[in-house]
């Protein structure tokens, strides 16, 4: 099998996975040259985390950084007089689905020997990257709006991350993080292509939970859309 690489789908520019980067030279998002799928026989059923689907990741990561993310309950319930199945992602280690993306992204950054990262987040993304950064031995800076939830800021700090409060809008927070990213690697859950490799495992889990059949429909609450993009 050919080695995967990163590609800017706007320009066609290609980048090796050996080069730490989160965007193209023209600041466009990056995707993988090949998006691998998986068959039931490739699932590592003894692994009780998203790493049971590691055969679907674009490259080998021999030493994953895992806190037991994934394998969350799928619970039947009545919703507007219809039968629905609820995926309880709040059972994740830090309380959200973003642990899936953080696990794969931080595992890959550790493999690339990244020592310090910065991320802009108003809550769950920052908590996930702070936790998995601590598990990976990577120093984490979280840039967050000054009006962010106090309990969420406390959670981020509890994992040992440095919190940088920015007055103003969410966009101003992102700009502050990008300024810091001139000297520290930008581990953005909205930009780094390996983050979606983690969130896509939600789709594999639903498929496996339903005896390897896709659900009729998936309803996903969304902000930036990483859960939707992962399942897609």
Indicate where each model-derived feature is located.
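PLP-dependent amino-acid enzyme catalytic core
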Residues: 1-232
